[in-house]
Amino acid sequence: MTVNTDAYLEFVNAVTSQPSKDADAFEYRIQELRGEGFETHRLLTAAVGMSAEAGEFTEVVKKIIFQGKPVNEENMFHLKRELGDLMWYVAQACMGLNISLDEVIEMNVDKLKSRYPGGEFDVHYSENRKEGDLCCLLYTSDAAD
């Protein structure tokens, strides 16, 4: 298969939102969100930071599992430090959403209890979400756009 990379780049540009490709549109959107009380600065810090720190945590796990890195005190300490960094960004997200970590955990427990009515993991329920499960709402909402 031959790929026309120029055509692909045109396609990517066409399906990219204005705030993602135009600095003025981006700045306008940030101001719009600020007017709505959306904590863009905290949530962007949290989102980018969680992604980066999760990558660092994953890198250590990958090296232990697939590349022979030893399971030793130093590597366990490294994992714990990366997990702490993740928690710092989770705290940023909580502040940006004006929610406590306790509330986040409680909401997660409620969601999982609803998803797994037997109180334990079930492959069927993990693959077949009930109506109203957030993943399905997001998918439906995105599909409608």
Regions found by a protein language model. Name each.
Residues 62-65, 94-101, 116, 120:
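Long, hydrophobic, amphipathic alpha-helical segments used as structural scaffolds
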Residues 102, 106-138:
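Short, C-terminally biased terminal segments at protein or domain edges
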Residues 39, 71-72:
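Acidic, serine/threonine- and proline-rich low-complexity regulatory regions
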Residues 64-70, 77:
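Catalytic phosphate/metal-binding cores of nucleic-acid and nucleotide-processing enzymes, i.e., regions
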Residues 47-58, 73-108:
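An amphipathic alpha-helical micro-motif enriched in hydrophobic residues
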Residues 139-145:
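Conserved small/polar residues in nucleotide/adenosyl-binding loops
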Residues 1-65:
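Extended low-complexity intrinsically disordered regions
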